[in-house]
Amino acid sequence: QRTRLVELDGEPVRLIQSWEGSDTVLIIDAVRSLHPPGTIHHFRADGISGAAADGIALGGGHLLGLGEAIDLARALCLLPRDLDVVGIEGADFELGQGLSAPVASACDLATAQLVDQLEQLLLSLVSRSGAAARPAARR
């Protein structure tokens, strides 16, 4: 088992290649809807169709992006067993714009949520493997 952190541009083929062979994938991406900037949304791949999930446009500033990658991976039987998306509502998708204060704050919160999710995933893997964490013996 290994864990990788990957930063990508949202291009569908690169996304699919990045999660190839993975059982569990956690993604943070920008989204666009009528919600206020900085709103955090949670989706599972089975709730995503096309470029949208629950009426929220995935991949905020990408022409083609995460939603299309998930659809393509599903069609090619390359979708990981578990794929979760944390979508952060963007404020401005123009080139060269930095993050607004609400979006930057949401990024910090979403990162903390992903770390918690990773910790839970690792604990679940350890318990499923039957390996218990034991303190090192002292001499």
At which residue positions do the language-model features occur?
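N-terminal catalytic or cofactor-binding beta/alpha core of small enzyme domains
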Residues: 1-88, 97-109, 113-139
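Short, internal active-site loops enriched in acidic
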Residues: 90-92
